[in-house]
C-alpha cells in the first residue's frame, strides 16, 4: 500500500515487438529510447513507468536459456534512465506470452508441457532477479503480460495461471537481495478485470506478507 500511495501517476513505455516478430526498439516507428524521454515524463509529474520487455529472441538454448549479454545490458540501461530519476519502474516478460508461437512466444505453452515451460520461466526469471537484486522497492517485477489458457477448461485454466503466479513469487523471494521484499505485480487472467475478479483466480501466497 505504501508503494501504491507513492506511485502517483504512470505511463507505459514502448511495445517493442512488430508484426514480423523480430524484436527491435525502432520497428514500430519510434526512436531508440534515451534518457530524455524519462526526463520529460518526470517533468510532467509522472513518477512510474512500465517497461514491457520481450526476451524470446535473446535467449540461448536449454537448459540454461542464457540471456544475451547485450540485451540484458540494454534492458538495464533503459531501466536506469527511469530509476536514476527516482521513478518507479515495472519490468516483465512481455511478448513471450503472446499468441504468435511461430515467432517464438512460449508462455502459453504451459498448457501443453508445464515442465518444459517451467524450466524456461525459472531460468529467465532467475537471471532477471540476479541482475536487479540490489535495486530497491522502486523496481517492481511483473509475472507475465496478458496471459490466459482458453484451450483448457476454465477451472483448469485458472488453476494453471494461479500455479504460474505462485511459482513466480516463490522464485523471486528466494533469489536474494531486495527481491525478498520488493513489490510484485501479479498477472490477472488475460489482464481482464472481470475475469480476474472470478472466484477461481487466487492471489499467490507471499512470505513477504508474513
Segments predicted by a language model, with ranges:
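Aromatic-lined substrate-binding rim segments of carbohydrate-active enzymes
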Residues: 27-100, 120, 161-178
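Active-site region of glycoside hydrolase catalytic domains
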Residues: 115-210
Amino acid at each position: 500500500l505504501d508503494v501504491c500511495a507513492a506511485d502517483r501517476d504512470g505511463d507505459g513505455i514502448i511495445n517493442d515487438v512488430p508484426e514480423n516478430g523480430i524484436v527491435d526498439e525502432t520497428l514500430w516507428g519510434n526512436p531508440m529510447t534515451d534518457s530524455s524521454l524519462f526526463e520529460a515524463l518526470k517533468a510532467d509529474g509522472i513518477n512510474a513507468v512500465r517497461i514491457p520487455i520481450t526476451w524470446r529472441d535473446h535467449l540461448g538454448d536449454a537448459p540454461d536459456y542464457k540471456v544475451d549479454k547485450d540485451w540484458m545490458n540494454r534492458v538495464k540501461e533503459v531501466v536506469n534512465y527511469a530509476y536514476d530519476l527516482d521513478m518507479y519502474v515495472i519490468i516483465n516478460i512481455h511478448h513471450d506470452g503472446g499468441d504468435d508461437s511461430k515467432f517464438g512466444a512460449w508462455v502459453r505453452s504451459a498448457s501443453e508441457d508445464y515442465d518444459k515451460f517451467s524450466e524456461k520461466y525459472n531460468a529467465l526469471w532467475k537471471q532477471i532477479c540476479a541482475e536487479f537484486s540490489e535495486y530497491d522497492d522502486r523496481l517492481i517485477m511483473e509475472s507475465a503480460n496478458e496471459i490466459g489458457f482458453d484451450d483448457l477448461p476454465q477451472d483448469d485454466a485458472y488453476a494453471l495461471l494461479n500455479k504460474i503466479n505462485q511459482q513466480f513469487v516463490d522464485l523471486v523471494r528466494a533469489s536474494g537481495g531486495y527481491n525478498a521484499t520488493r513489490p510484485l505485480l501479479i498477472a490477472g487472467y488475460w489482464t481482464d478485470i472481470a475475469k480476474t475478479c472470478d472466484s477461481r483466480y487466487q492471489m499467490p501466497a507471499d512470505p513477504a506478507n508474513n
